[in-house]
């Protein structure tokens, strides 16, 4: 039985985050030939259980996010050195990989995430550190995983390495029968950051009169607070605090008429993959990542004018919207199920 250590997440049971959900489902769909050990943040879990989904849990008393993520990942890597395989999710701890390769015979597999160093939210120093960490991850890993074909292309063009493309599952969100008689609101769900085109979406809806339910961490940043102040008085826009309850999310997603996805960076986004399982039309920001995820079959916008044209022409576009919804579901079922994703990971071990 192969021993696989997973490094780089807050841990399981998943409280939030794409990587945590990935780990929860890798362990849930694990075959009998795999024994996982997952490193967890002692700061995240008040109750520290020893096992979950058949995986052993090891706690490190540091935060998994922010500046502490670097020593958190490094300590996790050092404790993983006797494993058969180390699966690293994200690159922040990869500064330690040259040492790990010297002291361990483990196979190193790294999911480099969504080109974090390119994100506008980071300052110059953090961007440089993340870029260097990415370089180390690619250079010192036996296998590199990319969650989107565009990132696979980036790795090939910049490092000459063939990354393996494995996305995320989304079928865990289906908690019942999806409501086909949709309500009259559009739904959007994301971290409230400029790169997710939050203001573009809000501004367009403020002028259109269409109903929008927008879920996000509005009070976690000055940008989010600014958005609340600017748009909270529009009666057609409902700005909802983060929802982590999967049943509540199911109801919101199930009843929406369409989903608006503003992400412009980060590879394959879990929230997009998840909504595709609901057979809802997707209005996505026009970038290579989103086009790959939706196989060029969503409706795309690059600015307010594009989005408003879709919103203002629902009747004319009804057949296109219906076909889009059917395509989203078909793509989700063929590409984005956790059983398939878990099998793809295990094939690399």
Regions inferred by a protein language model and the residue ranges of each:
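Donor nucleotide-sugar binding/catalytic pocket of nucleotide-sugar-dependent glycosyltransferases
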Residues: 110, 134-175
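Membrane-proximal helix-turn-helix segments that form the acceptor-binding/catalytic region
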Residues: 78-81, 126-144
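Nucleotide-activated donor-binding/catalytic signature segment of Leloir-type glycosyltransferases, i.e.
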Residues: 216, 225-246
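N-terminal strand-loop element at the rim of the active site
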Residues: 9-16, 28-66, 150-152, 156-158, ...
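Short hydrophobic beta-strand element within catalytic cores of glycosyltransferases
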Residues: 258, 280-284
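Conserved donor-binding/catalytic core segment of Leloir-type glycosyltransferases
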Residues: 5-7, 179-215
């Amino acid at each position: 039985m192969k021993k696989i250590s997973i490094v780089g997440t807050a841990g399981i049971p998943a409280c939030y985050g794409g990587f945590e959900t990935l780990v929860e489902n890798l362990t849930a769909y694990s075959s009998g030939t795999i024994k996982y050990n997952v490193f967890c943040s002692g700061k995240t879990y008040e109750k520290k259980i020893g096992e979950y989904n058949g995986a052993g849990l090891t706690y490190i008393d540091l935060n998994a996010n922010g500046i502490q993520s670097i020593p958190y990942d490094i300590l996790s890597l050092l404790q993983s050195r006797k494993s058969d395989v180390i699966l690293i999710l994200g690159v922040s701890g990869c500064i330690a990989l040259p040492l790990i390769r010297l002291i361990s015979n483990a196979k190193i597999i790294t999911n480099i995430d969504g080109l974090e160093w390119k994100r506008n939210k980071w300052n110059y120093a953090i961007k440089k550190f993340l870029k260097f960490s990415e370089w180390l991850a690619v250079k010192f890993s036996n296998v590199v995983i990319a969650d989107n074909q565009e990132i696979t292309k980036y790795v090939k063009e910049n490092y000459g390495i063939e990354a393996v493309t494995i996305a995320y599952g989304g079928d865990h969100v289906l908690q019942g029968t999806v409501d086909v008689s949709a309500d009259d609101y559009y739904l959007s769900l994301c971290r409230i950051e400029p790169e997710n085109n939050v203001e573009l979406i809000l501004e367009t809806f403020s002028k259109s009169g269409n109903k929008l339910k927008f879920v996000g961490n509005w009070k976690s940043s000055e940008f989010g607070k600014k958005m609340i102040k600017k748009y909270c008085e529009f009666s057609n826009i409902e700005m909802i605090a983060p929802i982590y309850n999967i049943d509540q999310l199911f109801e919101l997603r199930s009843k929406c008429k369409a989903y608006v996805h503003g992400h412009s960076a980060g590879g394959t986004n879990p929230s997009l993959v998840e909504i595709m399982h609901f057979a809802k039309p997707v209005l996505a920001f026009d970038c290579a990542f989103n086009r790959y995820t939706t196989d060029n079959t969503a409706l795309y916008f690059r600015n307010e004018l594009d989005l408003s044209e879709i919103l203002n022409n629902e009747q004319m576009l009804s057949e296109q919207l219906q076909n889009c919804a059917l395509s989203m579901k078909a793509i989700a079922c063929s590409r984005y199920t956790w059983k398939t994703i878990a099998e793809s990971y295990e094939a690399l071990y």
